[in-house]
Design a protein with these regions (language model features):
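Thiamine diphosphate
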Residues: 1-162, 167, 302, ...
Length: 315
């Protein structure tokens, strides 16, 4: 049976496991170590763990300063505060001088659940993607997260990574030939009729949707686009040419995120039907995470409907 683990937990354990290997790695949190799972790094390496309290903007500024001293800071808080409250400091103190700071936003998307709209950050992909030079990613499972963390430690420059609250099935470790590389998507399943490009926990939904489509005689390709920026344009173009219809799916506002990135690129280079699946420009609501996701159609059935819509739009 596949491992089921929240990407936030996989992240916290992976970061802690790298503490000895990378003595310049430092970890910041804003009084949320138990939720963001940086508690594992704190336990493993307390002298390089800094709890800044509920002062996210200050935390980013201090991390920027430490990066100038040769350290590799990972800054942690909820996605709403990382992409929202501290956005100006991320833009001006980290991205503008192109400093080597990694901003990690946990509890992203609708699946925060009961905390409701004020904490359901569905805008972080768009907000962070708009910052020049900012790498933006959201791994889909524990295996991919572990690989992403070390890749980020060795990546020089500013980056934003979203983590999820819910435990999700590990799927990438059973894909033949799977490998992780920043800026490069991974084809998890081949298909000829439509391509589903997914990010984060929507990858698992996309694989389930592909099974449902197969039952209807539709061959769906599934791409795990863990890195939203820079977008793997080569892989997107290949899928566009070979399947002639694309669905993007994300646990985020469809404005400015993965769907926008794919549509912008293909609109200028190889126009085909692109249908975006995600939150349609509205706030979230409070409730059990699975119920909230279903209320917004963020599930396999929602992806199936969008895939059939994209196929119907083919010329």
């Amino acid at each position: 049976m596949a491992e089921k683990i929240a990407t936030r937990e996989a992240y916290g354990k992976a970061l802690a496991a790298l503490a000895d290997k990378y003595p310049d790695l430092v970890c910041f949190d804003a009084d949320l170590a138990g939720a963001t799972m940086t508690k594992f790094f704190k336990a493993a390496c307390p002298e390089r763990f800094f709890d800044m309290g509920i002062a996210e903007a200050d935390m980013v500024g201090v991390a920027a300063g430490m990066s100038l001293c040769g350290f590799k800071p990972f800054v942690n808080t909820f996605a709403m505060f990382a992409a929202g409250r501290a956005w100006e400091q991320v833009r001006n103190s980290v991205a503008y001088p192109h400093l080597n700071v990694k901003v990690v936003g946990s509890h992203g998307g609708l699946s925060v659940g009961e905390d409701g709209a004020t904490h359901q950050c569905i805008e972080d992909f768009a907000i962070m993607r708009a910052i020049p030079g900012m790498l933006v990613l959201c791994p889909c499972d524990g295996n991919e997260m572990r690989l992403a963390v070390e890749a980020l430690v060795n990546y020089e420059g500013p980056a934003y990574m979203r983590l999820g609250r819910l435990a999700v099935e590990t799927v990438t470790d059973s894909i033949p030939g799977y490998k992780f590389e920043l800026g490069k998507g991974a084809t998890l399943r081949d298909g000829t009729d439509v391509t589903i490009i997914a990010v984060g926990m929507n990858v698992q939904m996309a694989l389930a949707a592909a099974d449902l489509l197969a039952a209807d005689g539709i061959s769906a390709r599934v791409i795990d686009m863990h890195t939203i920026k820079p977008l793997d344009r080569e892989l997107v173009l290949k899928a566009a040419k070979e399947t002639s219809a694309i669905v993007t799916t994300e646990e985020a506002n469809v404005l400015g995120g993965l769907g926008a990135a794919v549509a912008e690129y293909l609109g200028e280079t190889y126009p085909i039907p692109v249908v975006r699946h995600g939150v349609n420009d509205e706030f979230g609501r409070s409730g059990k995470a699975p119920l909230v996701l279903d209320a917004y159609g963020i599930n396999a059935d929602g992806i199936v409907a969008k895939a059939k819509q994209a196929i119907a739009m083919k010329k």
